[in-house]
Amino acid sequence: MRVVLIVDIVRQEEKLIAKALEENKVQYDIINVAQEPLPFNKALGRYDVAIIRPVSMYRALYSSAVLEAAGVHTINSSDVINVCGDKILTYSKLYREGIPIPDSIIALSAEAALKAYEQRGFPLIDKPPIGSWGRLVSLIRDVFEGKTIIEHRELMGNSALKAHIVQEYIQYKGRDIRCIAIGEELLGCYARNIPPNEWRANVALGGTPSNIEVDEKLKETVVKAVSIVHGEFVSIDILEHPNKGYVVNELNDVPEFKGFMVATNINVAQKLVEYIKENYSK
């Protein structure tokens, strides 16, 4: 079996994956798509599995698609990346299958966004369908703040950033929950605790990880959400609603896991390589 690790920025997670591949004596190459092209030819077909790890959604999506065209099994597939990389597409899949999500209104223009604010009521969350690390996710307390956010988003070149997901503001327990799944297995979950002077729990923004006990309802919600999007290696962000219980906030197709490892002591990279060897060895 030969594996290719696709990257654009080599973070701690990619170093851990490379180390796990070496320790498990798996042949592998690294292709940095920020520097190297991907040809549509049979050369890429020498790989059996591609681990897709670019930070950029579009680099991840397109590199996965090119490798799939060469007959390579990609983790994750371009279909999974396309759905998980766009929160509107994610919510559409989950809502159709009855998975709890935050109450959400989609607005595709500035005028529609103002109407969505009025329907939702303040405070509310407004975020675009694409993006990571809490970027451009706004807590809006009144219409004046809302108009400012809309004006700024209208100036952005990417049309997706002008789309608005208007949501209820769920502030409960001062944390959110991140879980990681590989294949059909839930590896575990941990809490991301909101830091001082912040309302978001992202580790990139200073959120601190802590271990939690996974109950059956949380496990059921996560496993079903993963199966709906056909994710093979994904993280799942969960909010705790005071009335609705666990709601799925988003799924990540190129999951970061250093905070998860600190909180749970689970070696995610090793688990990923074991999964690949068990399912795709030749």
UniProtKB/Swiss-Prot annotation:
Transmembrane in keyword set: no
One of the record's GO molecular function terms: metal ion binding
Motif position, GF motif that is essential for ArgX substrate specificity: 259-260
Pathway, per record: Amino-acid biosynthesis; L-arginine biosynthesis
Origin superkingdom: Archaea
Catalysed transformations (reactions): [amino-group carrier protein]-C-terminal-L-glutamate + L-glutamate + ATP = [amino-group carrier protein]-C-terminal-gamma-(L-glutamyl)-L-glutamate + ADP + phosphate + H(+)
Positions of Mg(2+) 2 binding: E250, N252
BP terms from Gene Ontology: L-arginine biosynthetic process; lysine biosynthetic process; protein modification process
Cofactor list: Mg(2+)
Oligomeric form and interacting partners: Homotetramer. Interacts with LysW.
Protein's name according to its UniProt entry: Glutamate--LysW ligase ArgX
